[in-house]
Amino acid sequence: MSLNEKIRHYRIKIKNMGFVAAVGKSIDYRLDCFVMWFAKQIYAKTPLLDTIVLESHNDFDSNGGAFYDYLIKKGYNKKYKIVWMLNNPKPNDLPENVEGYYIYKPSFRKAYHLCTAKYLLSCHFIYGSVREGQKSGYLTHGSISLKKTSGNINLPDEINFVLTPSEFIAPIVADNFGIPYPDKRQIIIGFPVHDTFYNDVPGDLGKVTGNKYNKTILWMPTFRKSMDLNRDDSNGELPLGVPILRDMESCKALNDFLERENALLIVKIHPMQDLSTIKIQGMSNIVVLDRNSIKRLD
């Protein structure tokens, strides 16, 4: 990262978080690196434990969340300690043998688990193996990306495997993640979230609305401008913060169409999107959800 990029990066952080919070986060990061280094020296030769470390984009969601749900449903938390690396406050009702630690705050206990766990699985903040003998995997988040991300995501050599949905998409995944193709680390078995579409559990639409619709459409545009990654992935002007819809008049026309068809459109804003850019508003047949409202629904 060049000096100008670093300056821009910190300006964005200060704008989004405030000066004191931005400085505090920077200090926490450096302390966390030191604690992690210190823990590596202590636990480099100790036995690996039956621990699974999980991380996902917005905690308990995406592929990490789907895999976690599977582990709990099948009772694997009785054999394995499950440790979550969290972006948000830890829930008070975690199941037996499940712990959570804030991903960006220094914690010797967190470092201990990272150094002694047999498995490290991540969706967003990529954890590679910390020491020999560990198995680490990148589960990815969302579906496969429909935008070119090569150069923005580079999987570390310490990652043992990356999930891939099909042979056809494998070279695209490799290019997006900065790994050679072919690469034996690519495992073509689909994603844990795919299982959600093949179960008999009723959906969660009732948490969003009590109305009945002929059709429900879920639109999940990827982020254009991130809140803290110093990235702006769109050169186009987006007055409402999302593509396609140019102004509130077009939203009103779309809402009128949905109303005539008795259809609901759910616009799910990407968790990393800078919410200050989002101007689209909910209407009778349009619901707008972001990372904060999703957590409130849970």
Q: Could you tell me what each predicted segment is?
A:
Residues 1-50:
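Membrane-proximal basic amphipathic "stem/tether" segments
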Residues 40-42, 109-110, 125-126, 205-207, ...:
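Generic recognition of flexible, low-complexity loop/linker segments
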Residues 49-200:
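Active-site and donor-binding regions of nucleotide-sugar-utilizing enzymes
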Residues 53-56, 236-245, 293-296:
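Surface-exposed cleft-lining segments at the edges of enzyme active sites
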Residues 62-68, 193-279:
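Conserved catalytic-core segment of nucleotide-activated headgroup transferases in glycan assembly
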Residues 99, 153-154, 180, 203-204, ...:
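Short secondary-structure boundary/capping segments
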Residues 103-117, 266, 271-298:
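Donor nucleotide-activated moiety binding/catalytic core segment of transferases
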Residues 112-114, 155, 210, 257, ...:
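Structural alpha-helical scaffold elements that stabilize or flank donor/cofactor-binding regions
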